[in-house]
A protein has these predicted regions:
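Sec-dependent N-terminal signal peptides
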Residues: 6-11
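N-terminal secretory targeting modules
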Residues: 4-5, 16-162, 166-188, 371
Length: 371
């Protein structure tokens, strides 16, 4: 009986201390190895990355942001801030795998161990939306005495995908259409955008966000939302407006715009405002990338009525643009029918994304002469 009371008392003491916020955090062993800061010049970044907050820490929140480096040694670890989220990692071009940074404190995750001694290459892609997690990459940890070496040059071919939840990879790892949104089932690596880019041997950026529209975000007011894609597009980080993005840092030869699913997915929309804002946004994109070919896409999710309206609008915009700009194009994905399954909340499944990539690839190969 005495033992039981002691255990109960200990439990109460711990609970009271936790409630008071006075729990002392554990002291962990120091990180062993050579720490390489995120600002190291031999680390390559693709995507919108900011060092404004801390010159040695890389901040980002768009899915598809990629970090690459070549290193000496037999192991590699990665440092991130607490709860940064999920990445896909690939070592020496082998099978990619998913890693997560979900600890309450700064995280260290092993990406590779027991590699043959020599030079190796790591590619790490952020595969979720980091708006609420505020992800930070803080560097790599190498074996003692080892260091980074010059990495192979990034591909000369560059693509930018501007999109919404489809391009993000919302629910792509789920196999149940009734599942809610979860970071655990979002994965940009598995999207049509990444598959297309890999197939074309191109680097790509993804300026995409679930729920975003060109004039009206998901289920927004008929008059539109102020925080739509045209407004967010100017900034380095989504929904953080203290740093404008320098478009000279990344000039793609190809831009694919896939916006409209959220604008038109619920009934309270104004098709004329959609067209007006799309025209203005197209001019903005052209002003940022004067030499790029721009393709306006329609996605696979809208119903027949809304999809028909969207296609008519984009066809008209394209025809008008082509009077003075011959490098504006159109492409429609086929509708998802359910035969390939659905991801979470009726979004495209992994197989549907593969089908989308298979549809888009021949069009882009011919358009860009990228064989």
């Amino acid at each position: 009986m005495k033992k039981v009371w002691v255990m109960m008392l200990a439990t109460l003491m711990v609970s009271s201390t936790m409630m008071a916020g006075n729990v002392k955090k554990s002291t962990t062993l120091p990180i062993e190895g050579e720490i390489v800061k995120a600002s190291h010049p031999m680390i390559q970044y693709v995507g919108r990355v900011s060092f404004a907050k801390n010159p040695d820490v890389a901040s980002f929140n768009y899915p598809g942001t990629t970090i690459e480096a070549s290193f000496q040694g037999s192991s590699l670890k990665m440092l991130c801030s607490p709860k940064t989220g999920y990445f896909m990692a690939q070592i020496d071009g082998c099978e990619p795998f998913k890693v997560g940074f979900n600890a309450e404190r700064d995280s260290v995750v092993t990406l590779a161990a027991a590699l043959p001694k020599g030079v190796h290459h790591a590619k790490v892609m952020y595969v979720i939306e980091g708006l609420f997690r505020k992800p930070e990459f803080r560097g790599f940890v190498l074996d003692k005495g080892c260091h980074l070496v010059e990495a192979p040059a990034l591909p000369e071919r560059k693509i930018e995908f501007i999109g919404n939840l489809i391009t993000c990879g919302y629910g792509v790892e789920s196999i149940n259409r009734s599942d809610p949104f979860e970071d655990e089932t979002e994965n940009h690596w598995l999207t049509y955008a990444n598959i297309v880019s890999d197939s074309l041997k191109a680097q790509h950026t993804s300026i995409s966000r679930s729920g975003i529209g060109v004039y009206r975000n998901y289920n927004g007011p008929k008059t539109g939302d102020a925080d739509n894609m045209p407004w967010q597009y100017e900034y380095t980080l989504f929904d953080q407006h203290d740093e404008k993005w320098d478009f000279a840092k990344y000039q793609p030869q190809l831009v694919c715009i896939n916006l409209g699913t959220n604008d038109l997915s619920t009934k309270n929309y104004d098709i004329q405002l959609y067209e007006k804002n799309y025209r203005m946004f197209l001019k903005t994109v052209r002003s940022k990338y004067p030499h790029a070919k721009i393709v306006m896409l329609t996605g696979p999710m809208l119903g027949e009525k809304e999809s028909s309206k969207q296609r008519t609008v984009l066809d008209r915009i394209c025809a008008d643009a082509n009077k003075t700009d011959k490098n504006i194009y159109r492409f429609d994905f086929s509708f998802q029918k359910g035969d390939l399954g659905y991801g979470a909340s009726w979004h495209p499944s992994m197989l549907q994304h593969r089908k989308m990539a298979a549809e888009l690839l021949p069009f882009l190969r011919k358009l860009m002469n990228w064989n």
